[in-house]
Amino acid sequence: MSSLYQSMVAVIEQSITPLAGRLGQQKYVIAIRDGFTAALPFMIIGSFMLVFIFPPFSPDTTNGFARGWLDFSAHYRDQLMLPFNLSMGVMTFFISVGIGASLGRQFNLDPVMSGLLAFMAFLLVAAPYADGKISTQYLSGQGIFTALITAIYSTRVYAWLKQNNVTIRLPKEVPTGVARSFEILIPVLVVIGTLHPLNLFIEAQTGMILPQAIMHVLAPLVSASDSLPAILLSVLMCQIFWFAGIHGSLIVTGIMNPFW
């Protein structure tokens, strides 16, 4: 038993630990993890609001407190739904900004500007505007994959342009805030000039906007990730990483959060 245990430890240390270490330092895994972490407070508060909106009592209860709570929530349901709709209902806003800011920081970019650029890139393809209204269908969980892709893409474009000095540079005498705004003009133009035509092309060819197309392609993978074997494998890998002295939860959730 001792030799078997030592063999298992050796295999983990030689094979799994280096891989886990590389995953844990991977820029995109870190950015995705940070994006979901940034959105977490808003999602928690939004989830709590559902308890107030839908009290855990039977509609025919005779308890005075429960009856009052049910009547109050029914009468003010629209008002109580507002915090939920502006937190859980637009979770991809927070996720896209968090991913863009985290990835931008890792590429030595202005995290505020990279986060805002990621936010704009997501809105451009996921919130179609028609008849004076913006569609919110893909601003919640259905748009998570689109938020990941557009945030990573827009930040990479920003990083590449800055690394190759394809930016507008103002004299040092110009205030820093103004200079930062002009520096991101070209990245904004490139992101709009690539994502918007792509979205229009996909819609013309398939009748679906980009978030719909992404969800259609990834539907089998999402279904597979919700299966018992996938969940058991994720838990197993998490424990193996912990056993190897690595924060398994950060790595596994950073990869699997978009699917869960």
Predicted regions and their residues:
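Signature of multi-pass transmembrane helix bundles
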Residues: S2-I44, M49, S58, F72-A244
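Membrane-interface interhelical connector segments
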Residues: F57-S73, M256-W260
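Re-entrant/interfacial helical elements at transmembrane boundaries that shape
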Residues: G98, L250-W260
